[in-house]
Amino acid sequence: MSIGILGKKLGMSQFFDDKGRSVPVTLIEAGPCRITQLKSLATDGYSAVQIGYGFTREKLVNKPFKGHLSKSGEGFLRHLHEYRVDDLGVYELGAKITVGNFEAGQKVDVSGNSMGRGFAGYQKRHSFSRGPMSHGSKNHRQPGSTGAGTTPGRIYPGKRMAGRYGGKKITTRGLTIMKIDSDRNLLVVKGSVPGKPGSLLNIRPAQRVGSQNLTGGKK
């Protein structure tokens, strides 16, 4: 089972395949990451590999975090993430994780925080239909009815209404890696991924129930 990698979204572009078709892609600067901790079943209760990504200033790192990072011989990393694995024998503390762990044509799942849009109304947040726009109408973008009357006499929990939109963790599954640029640590992924340019992303081999052939990748 291959672990994932952390990266940064650079933006979207286009990629021309072998047949000359234009494919929308997202450029991701992935890694290099360092293995900062190996968690075993004996000491931690489960097997996992923890990696770190992105350097930061020393003044922003507290003493316990410094001691944790010193075990892997790495500098002051900003982001940590761990992946469950079955066999820890193929991983080594302090080893580097790069885009070379992936292959062109491989399916991956990409997770990140979606762009926050603040307080949004019914149309923008839930794609509700608007009201009449003709002269005299007073409910152009109003919610309309939100429930019954005396019975039940309340609005059921979970009713789709206006509120804060975006800014949540989103996972886009089954994206195809179109190209890998090892010299610049770039992954060219087909389609769009969550977040705005510069946001943190978690890229890992695709894992979907009933689709064993999607994982692929190198150990």
UniProtKB/Swiss-Prot annotation:
Pfam families: Ribosomal_L3 (PF00297)
Ranges where the record places region Disordered: 124-165
Molecular function GO labels: rRNA binding; structural constituent of ribosome
Keywords, in A-Z order: Ribonucleoprotein, Ribosomal protein, RNA-binding, rRNA-binding
Subunit field text: Part of the 50S ribosomal subunit. Forms a cluster with proteins L14 and L19.
Function: One of the primary rRNA binding proteins, it binds directly near the 3'-end of the 23S rRNA, where it nucleates assembly of the 50S subunit.
Homology family: Belongs to the universal ribosomal protein uL3 family.
UniProt-recorded name of the protein: Large ribosomal subunit protein uL3
Organism: Prochlorococcus marinus (strain MIT 9211)
Gene expressing this chain: rplC
